[in-house]
Amino acid sequence: PMLRGLYTGWTGMVNEQKRLDVISNNLANADTLGYKQESVSSQSFDKLLTIKIRDGSQSYHNQAIGTMSLGVKVGEVYTDYSQGSIRGTSSPLDLALSGSGFFTITTTNAKGETVTRYTRDGSFQLTKDGYLVDSQGNRVQGSGGDIQIDPNAKDITIDNSGRITVDGEVKDTLKIVDFENYDYILKTGDNLYRVVDGATETT
């Protein structure tokens, strides 16, 4: 019983530590553009049947006398995708998504492969070659792939539908996608998300 009590207390401390880790991460990213905060749920371990082993005063069969729990465990760490605040800037390349959806970008993984990722962070800029990139230098995707704009253009506008107009000429449209079920997208760091098997993309 004493060991069981210690174990139950230990599970509570582990659960509380995970909750504090999640809160600390949310606070550290309070000013991160496009960041979605996380929360953690808790649940009890499955209850075990408690049995009184027969002794001289009991009948031959062991007797069930109730159930007991062995403490608490982390149930799920989940992301809150509700709309965050939107701040205006003077840059025509600073964008924000109102409602659901993600910008599509490409990046390079540890194997050197080009992979697709998704982000809510719309703080974009142009490289010296005119590619539209995010704050990490990953290329933003349009309907035709990488978006390239004349870096010397005098007038760049992006309307509410994601259509990019450069000096009066439509160049491309941002590839903005959404997913039927957010349980199939995972955070990968640097404010990016990836999809897992089963994800259904919508546009």
Where are these regions (language model features)?
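Amphipathic alpha-helical polymerization modules
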Residues: P1-T203
